[in-house]
């Protein structure tokens, strides 16, 4: 049939890309082949705009076992164990059907982890919504949170960390980024590489339906006109639990050569990717694929994104053992093809060839684009705004401002979110959500443990995408350092608008360059990740949102500390005393502005502050640690008091004098700042430690009592602050 523009739009190929495919193939592709090319050449699968840029990121390091290019990254922990980590987006499906979109996002990221041979032990999520007082945003919020909790809870995997942010720019395009970590024996890791011609290709899991067809291309274009409910998959966490356990068991047979999740572009992507990595070809017969719907065409079978499916390459000598294990788990597993040595992805239907493409054409020949990059003038104007031109906060207004910030959705307690998640199942959670700047998990049978967190301040990234992304890396690392963990590796999820627009491509370029610089200076490799572009509707884009997921290692999990103050003791500030109002939560709440330059970031000072905090925790000097981020110093102090359920008396005169303004000193934001509570009698040790690391330090006050007192500015019962903080999100939703 002739290829007309309507068909090209359906598969998200431009006329130029179609001409490229014809030239490379030496003939016109048929409709099935065209759909396969469109899916694998989509932004979602082919990374057309980001692939050249991602090469700038540091991906190697002394602990890295597996970097980008596999289902997930892996980092050495010690004693023969590795931690496997990955983050991915499910933004577009969640905007259409929030519950199932978020739920299947969790399912997909979990499959990426056990596809490596690792047992998933924890989840984290990074979420973005519009203003929560709006009914549609409440619908999205409750749907997404409910979907994450439902799928994770049913799977028996705790959701222990994450972050959430609310801003008008996310009204039409919410973001749902899901992260999973797993633990494996290094020797048991398996790669998704289809080696060994003659080995068998096995499809296991759910029967294939029509759900999710064109899901990859849907996530690669801006198309607000169409209803896309049909491309949102429906998840079955109970089936995934069986799949997880069965896949880990069949790996023990030694007969499994490769394993791959069926995610975006379904069977097409999974088979092409494992063949490409293995330097082989694959022949499949779609007539052998179990289906739950009648009349499905080869096109639909190859592009279906039905959930809870895995593709395995199995040695023929072990196939009976593998299939027997799957039967015992009551899973439908069938041999649908074999590995070949001709480098082709050949699709049969009842033995007749219906599509045949070179694997390299699908995976390596996807065009890449370098676009014009130009910063939007409106953003330059916003960044040039000087917050000092605004009237300063008056002393009598400080307590009221503190209350307003504590109940604002971007600062209020996240308990209404994480209470819907089972965060203690598996009995590994040492520091749960809300107790610390990062979650801490033990590894059974080991003294060491891991910490994990996600971070990104989109206001900073909007105003300065390079600096804002550097802040995201620094804050994520600071968060795991504040529990005593050494940052090991990062997995990133780059959420942006339409890269064909110069101002959006500029944001993407700047963000990746900023991430590369921060990771290089801090010595943290990027081992996996995901790119989600075209997050915009009718030309209105989301702010650049490069989410950083991080994993850290604690040498002794028993020595971790939380953010809550523990009993009476002195409190100190480590890091710079200077702050800024640019891009701050205060500026948005008080003046309704997202403007000014984000705080400067000295990466060398950041590195020293984090090392100082980690050593202080390891030596037992530091009893509690909390980084100063959104809301500034006063919010950080209040949060540590509220979490620890103890009051305190603090003084800020020197900070006010140094900053020259009351609002900047109390609610201004800055990088490289951590408040710490010190063990009785250990004040001198902290001062000596700070000097040794070259870190500024000053005393802020002392904990005790049941009131929160800041000089002559604030004197309130802690219980009142707790009430404001813990109900803020509930009242908004």
Swiss-Prot record:
Catalytic residue list: 44, 90 (proton acceptor)
Top EC category: ligase
Lineage, highest ranks first: Bacteria, Pseudomonadati, Thermomicrobiota, Thermomicrobia, Thermomicrobiales
Native source organism of the sequence: Thermomicrobium roseum (strain ATCC 27502 / DSM 5159 / P-2)
Domain of life assignment: Bacteria
PANTHER family reported for this sequence: PHOSPHORIBOSYLFORMYLGLYCINAMIDINE SYNTHASE SUBUNIT PURL (PTHR43555:SF1)
CDD domains per UniProt: PurL_repeat1, PurL_repeat2
NCBIfam families: FGAM_synth_II, PRK01213.1
Binding site for ATP: 47, 86, 492, 529
Subunit: Monomer. Part of the FGAM synthase complex composed of 1 PurL, 1 PurQ and 2 PurS subunits.
GO molecular function, one term: phosphoribosylformylglycinamidine synthase activity
Residues that coordinate or bind substrate: 89-92, 111, 233, 305-307, 532
Protein name: Phosphoribosylformylglycinamidine synthase subunit PurL
Catalytic activity of the protein: N(2)-formyl-N(1)-(5-phospho-beta-D-ribosyl)glycinamide + L-glutamine + ATP + H2O = 2-formamido-N(1)-(5-O-phospho-beta-D-ribosyl)acetamidine + L-glutamate + ADP + phosphate + H(+)
């Amino acid at each position: 049939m002739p290829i007309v523009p309507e068909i090209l739009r359906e598969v998200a190929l431009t006329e130029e890309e179609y001409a490229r495919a014809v030239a490379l193939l030496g003939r016109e592709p048929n409709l099935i082949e065209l759909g396969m090319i469109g899916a694998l050449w989509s932004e979602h699968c082919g990374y057309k705009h980001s692939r050249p840029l991602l090469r700038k990121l540091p991906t190697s390091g002394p602990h890295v076992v597996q970097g980008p290019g596999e289902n997930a990254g892996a980092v050495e922990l010690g004693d023969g164990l590795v931690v496997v980590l990955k983050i991915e987006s499910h933004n577009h499906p969640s905007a259409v059907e929030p519950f199932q979109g978020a739920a299947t996002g969790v399912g997909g990221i979990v499959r990426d982890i056990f596809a490596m041979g690792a047992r998933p032990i924890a989840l984290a999520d990074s979420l973005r919504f519009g203003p929560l007082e709006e009914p549609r945003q409440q619908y999205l919020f409750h749907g997404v949170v409910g979907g994450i909790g439902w799928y994770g809870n049913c799977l028996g995997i705790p959701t222990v960390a994450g972050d959430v942010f609310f801003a008008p720019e996310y009204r039409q395009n919410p973001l749902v980024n899901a992260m999973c970590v797993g633990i494996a024996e290094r020797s048991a890791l398996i790669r998704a590489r289809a080696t060994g011609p003659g080995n068998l290709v096995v499809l296991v899991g759910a029967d294939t339906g029509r759900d999710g067809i064109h899901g990859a291309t849907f996530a690669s274009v801006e198309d607000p006109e169409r209803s896309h409910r049909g491309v949102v998959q429906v998840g079955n966490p109970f089936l995934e639990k069986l799949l997880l356990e069965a896949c880990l068991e069949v790996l023990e047979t030694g007969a499994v050569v490769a394993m791959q999740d069926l995610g975006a572009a379904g069977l097409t992507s999974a088979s092409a990717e494992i063949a490409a990595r293995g330097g082989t070809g694959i022949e499949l017969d779609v007539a052998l694929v179990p289906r739950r719907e009648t009349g499905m065409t080869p096109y639909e079978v190859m592009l279906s994104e039905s959930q809870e499916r895995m593709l395995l390459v199995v040695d023929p000598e072990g196939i009976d053992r593998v299939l027997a294990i799957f039967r015992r788990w009551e899973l439908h597993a069938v041999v649908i093809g074999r590995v070949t040595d001709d480098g082709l992805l050949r699709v049969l239907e009842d033995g007749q060839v219906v599509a045949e493409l070179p694997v390299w054409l699908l995976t390596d020949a996807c065009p890449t684009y370098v676009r014009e990059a130009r910063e939007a003038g409106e953003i330059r104007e916003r960044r040039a705004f000087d917050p000092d031109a605004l009237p300063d906060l008056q002393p009598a207004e400080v307590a009221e401002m503190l209350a307003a910030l504590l109940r604002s959705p971007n600062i209020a307690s996240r308990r209404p979110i994480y209470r819907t998640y089972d965060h203690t199942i598996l009995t590994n959670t040492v520091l749960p959500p809300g107790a610390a700047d990062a979650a801490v998990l033990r590894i059974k049978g080991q003294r060491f443990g891991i910490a994990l967190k996600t971070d990104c301040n989109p206001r900073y990234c909007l105003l300065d995408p390079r600096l804002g992304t550097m802040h995201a890396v620094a804050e994520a690392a600071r968060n795991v350092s504040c529990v005593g963990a050494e940052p090991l590796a990062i997995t990133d999820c780059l959420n942006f608008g339409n890269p064909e627009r110069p101002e959006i491509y500029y944001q993407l370029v700047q963000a990746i360059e900023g991430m590369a610089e921060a990771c290089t200076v801090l010595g943290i490799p990027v081992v996996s990740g995901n790119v989600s572009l075209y997050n915009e509707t009718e030309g209105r884009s989301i702010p650049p949102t490069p989410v950083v997921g991080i994993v850290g290692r604690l040498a002794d999990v028993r020595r971790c500390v939380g953010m809550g103050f523990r009993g009476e003791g002195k409190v100190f500030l480590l890091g710079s005393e200077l702050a800024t109002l640019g891009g701050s939560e205060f500026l948005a709440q008080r003046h309704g502005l997202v403007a000014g330059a984000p705080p400067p970031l000295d990466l060398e000072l950041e590195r020293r502050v984090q090392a100082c905090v980690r050593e202080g925790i390891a030596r037992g000097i530091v009893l509690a640690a909390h980084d100063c981020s959104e809301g500034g110093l006063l919010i950080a102090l209040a949060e540590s008091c509220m979490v620890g359920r103890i009051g305190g008396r603090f003084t800020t005169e020197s900070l006010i004098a140094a900053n020259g303004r009351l609002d900047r000193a109390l609610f201004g934001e800055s990088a490289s700042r951590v408040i710490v509570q010190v063990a009785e009698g250990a004040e001198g040790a902290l001062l000596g430690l700070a000097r040794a690391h070259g870190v500024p330090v000053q005393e802020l006050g002392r904990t005790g009592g049941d009131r929160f007192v800041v000089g002559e500015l604030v004197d309130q019962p802690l219980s009142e602050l707790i009430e404001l903080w813990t109900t803020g999100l509930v009242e908004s939703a």
